[in-house]
C-alpha cells in the first residue's frame, strides 16, 4: 500500500510539473508582448494552480468553436459585399488632408474600402439630448432599426427609448437589439427583455456568461460596441451606453458618467451596418447584409459633408488595426494632440509614441477622470504618469464626474471617437468601433468639447507628483506589473 501511495504521489508531482511546463511552453510559443508573457509566467510560478486556471480561462483569445466557425464562414459573402460596394464610387473620398492621409491609407488597405464622404455629423454631449434625438429618429423610422450596446440599464430615459422601440416594432418596423450578456445583466433580469420580445423585437444576449464553458471561450471577451442604425441612413456611435446617468452606478462614488455620442446621416451608416451584420451573424448564425447605399435618397455630394472611416475590432476583424490607427494618428501629430479616456493602460508602443510626440514639440494633453470606477485600472494608470510628465505631456484630471468619453484630436483636423479605451482590453480583445473623421469643422466641435473637459479638470503638477507617498508608489508599481493583463 505504501508503494502504491508513493507511486501516486510521484505521478501527481510529475503531472503537476508537466502541466506547468506545458502552459509555460504554450505562453512562450504564442506571439505576444514580452511584458504580458512575463506577467503570466510570474503568476503561474508564484500561484501555480490559480495562475494556470486563470491563463486557461482568460489568457488566450477564444471566441468559442461555434462562433469561430461562423466568423470564418461569413467572410466570403462579406468580402463580396465590400467588393460590390466599391462600385458605388460616388461615396468614397479620393483625397484626404495631410495629417489624415496615412491613417486613411492604413484603414483602406487593412479593411478593403476607402473612407466615405458626404456624411452629416453632429456631436451630442448631453445624455438627455442623445436620448431625445434617438427617440425622434426611432419614431420616424420607416424600415429597420438595429442596436448594439454593452450596457442597457433600465431606468430613467432609457425606459422611454425602450418604449419607443417597442412602439416601432408594433407598427411593423424590423427591430434588432444585441446586448452584451455581462454588461446588460440588469436588463436581462428585468421584465424589459420579455416585453421587447413580445412586442416583436429580436433581442439577442451576446457572448453569454456561462461558467460551465469558461475553458472553451474567454468570459472577459465582451461586445463593447455602442451603435444604432436606422433605415440604413442614420447612425449613432460613441462612448454612451443605453443608461440614464442620473440612475446609473450612483453608489460608485465617482459622480455621473460624462459621455459623447455622434449622430450621423449618410453612407457611413452602411459601413457601420456591415459591422453590425458581422456581429449578428457571429452571434446568431443569421446573415443580414445591409443594402448598398441608395444615391436617390442620400445627399452624398453635399459640400459640407464629412469624410469618415469606420474601424471595427474584435475576433474576426482585422487584427491590431485600432492599435495601429492610434499609433499612426499619434505619429501624425505636428502641433497638438489631445486624448480623453476613462481607462489609461497603454501598450508600450502607444506610451512611447505619446512621449515621443511631446518630446518632438507637440503639445500633448491627456484628460482622465480623477475618480475611477475601476480600482485596478485607476492605480495602474498612475504608474504611467511619471514617464508622461517627464516627457512633457500634460495630464488633466477631470473632476466633473466619471469622464467616459473616448476621443483623440490631432492638429484640429483628424478626429477619432468611439468606444475604444486606451487600455489592453479595448486594444487587443473586445468588439469595439471607432470613427476616424477628416474634417476641420468637426475637429473644432470636438476641440470645444475637450476644452470644456479641461475647464472642469485639474492639471497634474509634476513637482507635487514626485513627492507622493512611498506607499502610493509601491501600489502603482504593483498594479503596473499586471497592467498587460488588465
Swiss-Prot record:
<keyword id="KW-0812">Transmembrane</keyword>
<feature type="active site">
    <location>
        <position position="224"/>
    </location>
</feature>
<keyword id="KW-1003">Cell membrane</keyword>
<feature type="active site">
    <location>
        <position position="231"/>
    </location>
</feature>
<keyword id="KW-0443">Lipid metabolism</keyword>
<keyword id="KW-0677">Repeat</keyword>
<dbReference type="InterPro" id="IPR022924">
    <property type="entry name" value="Cardiolipin_synthase"/>
</dbReference>
<dbReference type="Pfam" id="PF13091">
    <property type="entry name" value="PLDc_2"/>
</dbReference>
<dbReference type="InterPro" id="IPR030840">
    <property type="entry name" value="CL_synthase_A"/>
</dbReference>
<dbReference type="GO" id="GO:0008808">
    <property type="term" value="F:cardiolipin synthase activity"/>
</dbReference>
<dbReference type="InterPro" id="IPR025202">
    <property type="entry name" value="PLD-like_dom"/>
</dbReference>
<feature type="active site">
    <location>
        <position position="406"/>
    </location>
</feature>
<keyword id="KW-1208">Phospholipid metabolism</keyword>
<feature type="active site">
    <location>
        <position position="404"/>
    </location>
</feature>
<feature type="domain" description="PLD phosphodiesterase 1">
    <location>
        <begin position="219"/>
        <end position="246"/>
    </location>
</feature>
<keyword id="KW-1133">Transmembrane helix</keyword>
<keyword id="KW-0444">Lipid biosynthesis</keyword>
<dbReference type="Pfam" id="PF13396">
    <property type="entry name" value="PLDc_N"/>
</dbReference>
<comment type="similarity">
    <text>Belongs to the phospholipase D family. Cardiolipin synthase subfamily. ClsA sub-subfamily.</text>
</comment>
<feature type="domain" description="PLD phosphodiesterase 2">
    <location>
        <begin position="399"/>
        <end position="426"/>
    </location>
</feature>
<dbReference type="InterPro" id="IPR027379">
    <property type="entry name" value="CLS_N"/>
</dbReference>
<feature type="transmembrane region" description="Helical">
    <location>
        <begin position="38"/>
        <end position="58"/>
    </location>
</feature>
<dbReference type="InterPro" id="IPR001736">
    <property type="entry name" value="PLipase_D/transphosphatidylase"/>
</dbReference>
<feature type="active site">
    <location>
        <position position="226"/>
    </location>
</feature>
<comment type="function">
    <text>Catalyzes the reversible phosphatidyl group transfer from one phosphatidylglycerol molecule to another to form cardiolipin (CL) (diphosphatidylglycerol) and glycerol.</text>
</comment>
<keyword id="KW-0472">Membrane</keyword>
<keyword id="KW-0594">Phospholipid biosynthesis</keyword>
<keyword id="KW-0808">Transferase</keyword>
<protein>
    <recommendedName>
        <fullName>Cardiolipin synthase A</fullName>
        <ecNumber>2.7.8.-</ecNumber>
    </recommendedName>
</protein>
<feature type="active site">
    <location>
        <position position="411"/>
    </location>
</feature>
<dbReference type="GO" id="GO:0032049">
    <property type="term" value="P:cardiolipin biosynthetic process"/>
</dbReference>
<feature type="transmembrane region" description="Helical">
    <location>
        <begin position="3"/>
        <end position="23"/>
    </location>
</feature>
<keyword id="KW-0997">Cell inner membrane</keyword>
<dbReference type="GO" id="GO:0005886">
    <property type="term" value="C:plasma membrane"/>
</dbReference>
